[in-house]
C-alpha cells in the first residue's frame, strides 16, 4: 500500500502531497521536512529506495522534481517506480512535456490525474488511454459548466437592467 505521495522541487518546495494513511498536520510537516532533507542530499548515482521508519520510500527525479512514494516494507519497489513513471507519462501526455510550473498553476489537474491513477493507496487504473479519456471528459464537463454559468450570469444581468 502507498501511504503517501510527495512531489518536491530541488529547492525543497513541496509541489503536491497526497496522504493515504492518517497523519496529523504536525506529523505531515515532520515527514515532509525529514524526507525532503534526506532525498535532496542523496547523490544521483545512489539507489532510489530508502528504508525509513519501518517503511520504504521510493523516489525518482524528473527534471527539477522528485516524485516520492512511501510504501510498506513488503511491497515491490520496482512496481512503485513504474507507478511513478506511469504518473509522469500521463502528466506529460496531458500537459505536453510537464514542468514544475504546470503543477504549480494546474495543481488541481495534477491531483485529479493522481486520483484517477490511485485510490486508497493502490493502483486503480493502469491504462494511460483510459485515464486520458476520463480526464478529457472531465475537462469537457468543466467547459460546459462554465458556459452554462456564463449564460446564466448574462440572463441575470439583463434581467436586472
UniProtKB/Swiss-Prot annotation:
Gene Ontology BP annotations: intracellular protein transport
Keyword Protein transport included in the entry's annotation: yes
Annotated membrane topology: Peripheral membrane protein
Tissue: Expressed in seedlings, roots, stems, leaves, flowers and siliques (developing fruits and seeds).
Protein's job: Subunit of clathrin-associated adaptor protein complex 1 that plays a role in protein sorting at the trans-Golgi network and early endosomes (TGN/EE). The AP complexes mediate the recruitment of clathrin to membranes and the recognition of sorting signals within the cytosolic tails of transmembrane cargo molecules.
Native source organism of the sequence: Arabidopsis thaliana
Location within or outside the cell: Golgi apparatus; Cytoplasmic vesicle, Clathrin-coated vesicle membrane
Matching SUPFAM superfamilies: SNARE-like
Gene Ontology MF annotations: clathrin adaptor activity
Family matches, as InterPro entries: AP1_sigma (IPR044733), AP_complex_ssu (IPR016635), AP_mu_sigma_su (IPR022775), Clathrin_sm-chain_CS (IPR000804), Longin-like_dom_sf (IPR011012)
Family stated for the protein in its record: Belongs to the adaptor complexes small subunit family.
UniProt keyword annotation of ATP-binding present: no
Pfam annotation, one family: Clat_adaptor_s
Alphabetical keyword list: Cytoplasmic vesicle, Golgi apparatus, Membrane, Protein transport, Transport
Subunit (UniProt): Adaptor protein complex 1 (AP-1) is a heterotetramer composed of two large adaptins (gamma-type subunit and beta-type subunit), a medium adaptin (mu-type subunit) and a small adaptin (sigma-type subunit).
Protein name: AP-1 complex subunit sigma-1
A cellular-component GO term for this protein: AP-1 adaptor complex
CDD domains in the cross-refs: AP1_sigma
Gene3D superfamilies in UniProt: 3.30.450.60
Amino acid at each position: 500500500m502507498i501511504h503517501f505521495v510527495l512531489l518536491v522541487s530541488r529547492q525543497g518546495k513541496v509541489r503536491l502531497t497526497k496522504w493515504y494513511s492518517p497523519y496529523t498536520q504536525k506529523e505531515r510537516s515532520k515527514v515532509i521536512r525529514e524526507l525532503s532533507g534526506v532525498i535532496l542530499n542523496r547523490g544521483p548515482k545512489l539507489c532510489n529506495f530508502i528504508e525509513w521508519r519501518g517503511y520504504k520510500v521510493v523516489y525518482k527525479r524528473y527534471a527539477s522534481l522528485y516524485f516520492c512514494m512511501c510504501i510498506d516494507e513488503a511491497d515491490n519497489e520496482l512496481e512503485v517506480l513504474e507507478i511513478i513513471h506511469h504518473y509522469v507519462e500521463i502528466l506529460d501526455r496531458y500537459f505536453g512535456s510537464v514542468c514544475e510550473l504546470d503543477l504549480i498553476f494546474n495543481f488541481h489537474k495534477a491531483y485529479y490525474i493522481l486520483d484517477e491513477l490511485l485510490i486508497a493507496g493502490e493502483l486503480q487504473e493502469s491504462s494511460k488511454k483510459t485515464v486520458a479519456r476520463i480526464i478529457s471528459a472531465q475537462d469537457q464537463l468543466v467547459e460546459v459548466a462554465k458556459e452554462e454559468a456564463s449564460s446564466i450570469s448574462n440572463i441575470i444581468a439583463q434581467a436586472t437592467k
